[in-house]
Amino acid sequence: MEVKYVTVGALTKYIKRKFDVDPHLRDLWVKGEISNFKQHSRGHMYFTLKDSQGRIAAVMFAGYNQHLPFRPEDGMNVLARGEISVYEPNGNYQLYVKEMQPEGVGSLYLAYEQLKQRLEAEGLFSPVHKKPLPAFPRCIGVVTSPTGAAVRDIMTTIRRRYPLAKVILFPALVQGDGAAPSIVRAIERANSFGGVDVLIVGRGGGSIEELWAFNEEIVARAIFASKIPIISAVGHETDFTIADFVADLRAPTPTAAAEMAAPHVGELAERLAERKWRLIRAMKEQLAADKEQLRRLQGSYAFRYPKRLYEQKEQQLDALLERLSRQRERLVDKHRQRLHELDMRLWRHHPAAELERMKERQKAAANALEKAMRTAVERHRFRFRSNLARLEALSPLRIMERGYSLVYNEQGELVKRTNQLRIGEHLSIQVQDGRVDCQVTGVEEKHV
């Protein structure tokens, strides 16, 4: 009997088709806790959803997760929407997630808190980075929608308070898709425009979704990177956006931002009037003090007898002139003596004098050399004679003059002992005036 079978691959494909055609598994929300979360280098997210009764593998591809407003983490309870299917290579079923949000907490709020903590840790909110606002700006830039109420409020407030300032609008989207990049581009244009002293970035009020562009990371980093001081004005009294934390100054409304950026001409006039009054009062007080001092000086001894002021100084001047004259004479004598010394040194170093001295030294050296040579010759002559006398005293010829002779054997060797001789051996005897040949007839050894 032939057994019917299916291959593993065919069975897996069959089960996968069952999952794929089941309407209950094509689009569903799954609640669970994230564990084993990993994000691939290509952006895909892999994790497990679990509860007390089970677990299921899940994947969220980069095309879906790039728009997530929060960062998934292990231990986070979420609601995940997607479809169930089978991953054929290992036969496991898993949830293919297309949408996800935190359970119990709005995803926007979670994203806000996560970004806030991260940027604060990087130091973007630190007071050390806050730039001061100019006291009297000549040009005020505004980044907002050109059609909203915020731009009208800002323009009206600045013209009313400080008409001396020029206002430049850098239009941008302030809500919806593309709002955050639009705000970033407007801030960058304001920085590259040149001449903008302070920048207001904001919009009128709205829901958190409408204001969300001001919570985007790219907007926060553009505000932080701005060289121009920025006032955030996102039209809400109580809540803060990320832009508020990064900006150099936060205003609760666009109107308040305009008031912070532009001083009031009336207030300036009052301050100028007050300073003018204070200056006049100070000048009057100083003038009165100077008059009183002049009155006291006019009644003083010096003003009554003015000659006494310079009589003593004249005497001191005479003494100083006398000291100066003596000092000048000493200085002239000193330089005269110095000139004489230099003249003597110059004479000593004159070429003729130097040549004469060199001739004297050469003559003295020649005499000394001649004397030394004579002494050396005499010394060597004496040594030669002494050595010659010693050599003559040691010469064999001198010895033979005293009766001695030299005896040589047949081999021509000098005979010094009797043991060198044999009977019948011929000898040669060298005397002072010649040689004698003889033969040994007997040898007698002398014992000492």
Curated annotation (Swiss-Prot):
Keywords: Cytoplasm, Exonuclease, Hydrolase, Nuclease. Heterooligomer composed of large and small subunits. GO terms for cellular component: cytoplasm; exodeoxyribonuclease VII complex. Its EC number is 3.1.11.6. It is found in: Cytoplasm. It comes from the Bacteria. It comes from Geobacillus kaustophilus (strain HTA426). It holds the Pfam family tRNA_anti_2. It catalyses: Exonucleolytic cleavage in either 5'- to 3'- or 3'- to 5'-direction to yield nucleoside 5'-phosphates. One of its GO terms (biological process) is DNA catabolic process. The lineage of its organism: Bacteria, Bacillati, Bacillota, Bacilli, Bacillales. Belongs to the XseA family. HAMAP family: Exonuc_7_L. Bidirectionally degrades single-stranded DNA into large acid-insoluble oligonucleotides, which are then degraded further into small acid-soluble oligonucleotides. This is Exodeoxyribonuclease 7 large subunit. Disulfide bonds: none annotated.
